[in-house]
Amino acid sequence: MFIKRSDYASAYLKIKEASVSGGCTVQLFVALDPDALCACKLLSTLLKGDFISHKIRPVSGYRDLEQANKTLLEQNEDIKFIILLNCGTMVDLNNYLVSMEDVSIYVIDSHRPHNLNNIYIENNIFVFDDGDIEEDMNKIHDAWYAFNSHELSDEENSDSSNEREEEVEDDNRSVESYSSSDYQARSRRRFSEETTQRRAEIKEKRKKRKEFASILSEYYEKGSWYGESITNILFAVASMLGREDNDMLWLAIVGLTCLEIHCQSSKKYFNRSYSLLKDEVNRLNPSPLENQIVGRAHGKTPHDQSIRLEDEFRFMLVRHWSLYDSMLHSAYVGSRLHIWSEEGRKRLHKLLAKMGLSLVECKQTYIHMNMDLKKTLKSSLKRFAPFYGLDDVIFHSFTRTYGFKCTLSASDVSYAISALLEMGNTGVLLQSKTVARSPDMTEEEYLEKFENAQNQEWLHNFYDAYDALDDVDSLERALKLAMHLQRAIVRTGITLLEKRAIKTLRSFRFGLINEGPDLKIFMHPLALTKMSLWIAEAINEQEREFGKLRHLPLVLAAFVEEKNRYLIVGTSTSAFTSNEDDDDDDGHGHNRFGVAFQEVANMTSATLQMDCFEASVIECQKSDLGVFLESLSFKTLL
């Protein structure tokens, strides 16, 4: 079943009512992505405020979810609610979670498409609707109910019915010699009319069933896309309860921004959410009157944690990096200036020179730049950036002040927590150092040991990021980590483009990362996805300059030596066009790689593993990569 937006508060109050008796009644399963992290923090704040005991368990994939569910919930009679954050809506949860009649399962997930069994079967599974189920899926709703109706399902037995009819005809013929000729004629005529009518009914039912099946297949085969930020959904819950505050508002802003910078936000949902959050910022953070301004700078006080609307540059971490590095490592600027080439870097230098900025000045940390130059930077960019294809270099965003310590933008925090999820506070990949292989260990035993160590490391990273959300010192340290990651992405991307290592196949482009100093970084799906987005945007912009409007999607693979597998990510071209063009009825552009990966898995003998909550991520045995790519090249990906 699904929960309408107007019923969010009622759904939460049921949790509160069930927790009166005490005990740990709520279990949270949280995907390892930034939006789910922010949503978990916000929901945990709500639950703590109502003194509701709960457990938080990050999960890395479907197998981990299934195993955690069995371990934590079997023989645990206290649990009354399971809440899934950014995981679960795309699969039939009855196949993954322990079924208990007195346990309600809440699914709050931005991944699409929904598994229709979760939202239409009346059981203990409740999917939070961001509006698309109620508003956009009426045709799907009617088709699902009709397809699964008892009346149409009877048609499946039509073949056996026909056989029985033929048997009756044989019986009729066997008694003809004992009947009068008049009786025989009437009997045959009556039976013929009934048979014709029955067959017509069966044919009509079969036709309707095929029509409904086609509608349902079309829904699933469109590929994967994204709905509203789940942090925004939970902020709506807090607002309905009258519990919203600045901390929750900031989490909602960061959650939305995370989707935007990872190309997972549709124009439809982003504009709607931005408008609502903008109103909340103005309501909860009124501008101080002139005679009320105290403190040293712009009305700041040591305890000021206000949120402000502010125009931002599409330069990564510009407040904390040098202006030059921020522009050089920005995907937006880099793709349009072609910074992977010497000519592209010269274009960047010319742009800075036209704005009156020397390279020496630009390579200083931004906060140490000349104040007059910083004041004129916005007007200079508006004047000169369009000549270099940077038409949208300035966009509306939010910042938060942390007393006299620092000011962070929503994108700063998004990059920071994303880096923590990928690498943790230590900034190293622990499993590459700690997983040793003994001589008597089989391949399967070592693989299991490595995957367990990897999952434990990712869980540790999750808690590092979770704690950093309310610790500005940890966030500032994580900014350095985000810079390190972005340098690795740009460095690797430039290498692939310079070597012309991105090959064009029948229906997609393909790139392979199987060596290099940064290979270990791309063992994490989130890091490899960022790398894929950077390369795809660079190629698409290059083609757009030559007038090509239809671009091929990109498949990027990174070799994981310990597993002897390739981690593979499929990036759709719509990831970049959806924010510029009008969205379709389903919001964000569709990525068909999940559907294609599943089809390849079903039709080949290649050893593949689809365990990630992102449908466009898959693992392939090293020896099967060629078979996998050959089969994939015949699939429709656009």
UniProtKB/Swiss-Prot annotation:
<comment type="subunit">
    <text>Interacts with sld3.</text>
</comment>
<comment type="function">
    <text>Required for initiation of chromosomal DNA replication. May have a role in regulating the MCM proteins nda1 and nda4.</text>
</comment>
<dbReference type="GO" id="GO:0031261">
    <property type="term" value="C:DNA replication preinitiation complex"/>
</dbReference>
<dbReference type="GO" id="GO:0005829">
    <property type="term" value="C:cytosol"/>
</dbReference>
<keyword id="KW-0235">DNA replication</keyword>
<keyword id="KW-0539">Nucleus</keyword>
<dbReference type="GO" id="GO:0000785">
    <property type="term" value="C:chromatin"/>
</dbReference>
<keyword id="KW-0131">Cell cycle</keyword>
<dbReference type="GO" id="GO:0005634">
    <property type="term" value="C:nucleus"/>
</dbReference>
<dbReference type="GO" id="GO:0043596">
    <property type="term" value="C:nuclear replication fork"/>
</dbReference>
<dbReference type="GO" id="GO:0006270">
    <property type="term" value="P:DNA replication initiation"/>
</dbReference>
<comment type="similarity">
    <text>Belongs to the CDC45 family.</text>
</comment>
<dbReference type="GO" id="GO:0031573">
    <property type="term" value="P:mitotic intra-S DNA damage checkpoint signaling"/>
</dbReference>
<dbReference type="InterPro" id="IPR003874">
    <property type="entry name" value="CDC45"/>
</dbReference>
<feature type="compositionally biased region" description="Basic and acidic residues">
    <location>
        <begin position="190"/>
        <end position="204"/>
    </location>
</feature>
<feature type="region of interest" description="Disordered">
    <location>
        <begin position="151"/>
        <end position="204"/>
    </location>
</feature>
<dbReference type="Pfam" id="PF02724">
    <property type="entry name" value="CDC45"/>
</dbReference>
<dbReference type="GO" id="GO:0003682">
    <property type="term" value="F:chromatin binding"/>
</dbReference>
<feature type="compositionally biased region" description="Acidic residues">
    <location>
        <begin position="153"/>
        <end position="170"/>
    </location>
</feature>
<dbReference type="GO" id="GO:1902977">
    <property type="term" value="P:mitotic DNA replication preinitiation complex assembly"/>
</dbReference>
<dbReference type="GO" id="GO:0000727">
    <property type="term" value="P:double-strand break repair via break-induced replication"/>
</dbReference>
<protein>
    <recommendedName>
        <fullName>Cell division control protein 45 homolog</fullName>
    </recommendedName>
</protein>
<dbReference type="GO" id="GO:0003688">
    <property type="term" value="F:DNA replication origin binding"/>
</dbReference>
<dbReference type="GO" id="GO:0003697">
    <property type="term" value="F:single-stranded DNA binding"/>
</dbReference>
